[in-house]
């Protein structure tokens, strides 16, 4: 792409054409994977049921004003379940795609192995207000979402520019509705079966949910660990017990 210089056919004296180059880009993979949807919804029902009970029990110990609000603004968050045998096919699929994502990005994984550090399901409260403020997952290499229940009426993920220098010096955009090189955030409107994979360093958030229709998704984080480290015994087990 040629940039700069004069927009007229006749080039003025001293005209220079610049060629555009693009570096330090942030990749986001989006695909539809409906083949796991039915079984995964059924599998995660029990995890959401348990998460609802845990949250209900927790609210019993909260101040009265929190009890009165109830679950508004909260979400039902499960424990990690990547080792559940019934999730095996989905976990393997996500692991393989995450490896391909890093490989495609240019990283040499010959001496690394990938490990799930977190793999959980969550559902926003049916009373509405469920959301995530902007955050990133520290010390992770791949993060992702798999959407189980969602619609045009539910929350959605928003991704933010991960470059601090860019954010600190941001200028006004000519068109806020158009994605350009100056865009500081983008969002996706998923549908059931949508899968999104992105670098673990990318800040993201979830828009406030209205509580009109169910919103449930799986979220995972993966770390690439040097093979020499992952094969060693944990140093924690070698330390003298107090």
Say what each PLM segment does.
Residues 119-121, 144-146, 218-222:
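A structural signal for short, well-ordered beta-strand segments
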Residues 56, 164-171, 239-242:
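Short, cationic low-complexity segments
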Residues 177-242:
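Catalytic core of Fe(II)/2-oxoglutarate
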């Amino acid at each position: 792409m040629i940039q700069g210089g004069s927009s007229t056919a006749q080039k003025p004296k001293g005209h220079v054409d610049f060629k555009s180059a693009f570096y330090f880009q942030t990749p986001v993979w989006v695909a539809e994977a409906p083949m796991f949807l039915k079984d995964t919804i059924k599998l995660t029902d029990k995890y959401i049921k348990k998460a609802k009970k845990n949250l209900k029990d927790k609210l019993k110990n909260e101040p009265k004003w929190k009890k009165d609000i109830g679950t508004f603004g909260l979400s039902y968050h499960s424990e990690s379940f990547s080792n559940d045998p019934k999730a095996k096919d989905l976990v393997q699929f996500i692991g393989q795609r995450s490896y391909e994502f890093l490989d495609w990005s240019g990283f040499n994984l010959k001496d690394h192995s990938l490990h799930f550090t977190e793999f959980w399901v969550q559902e926003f409260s049916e009373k509405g207000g469920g959301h995530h403020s902007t955050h990133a997952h520290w010390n992770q290499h791949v993060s992702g979402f798999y959407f189980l229940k969602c619609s045009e009426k539910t929350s959605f993920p928003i991704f933010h520019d991960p470059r601090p220098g860019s954010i600190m010096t941001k200028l006004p955009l000519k068109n806020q509705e158009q994605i350009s090189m100056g865009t500081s955030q983008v969002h996706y409107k998923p549908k059931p079966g949508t899968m999104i994979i992105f670098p673990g360093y990318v800040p993201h958030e979830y828009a406030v949910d209205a509580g009109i229709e169910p919103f449930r998704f799986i979220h995972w984080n993966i770390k690439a660990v040097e093979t020499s480290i992952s094969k060693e015994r944990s140093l924690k087990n070698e330390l003298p017990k107090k």
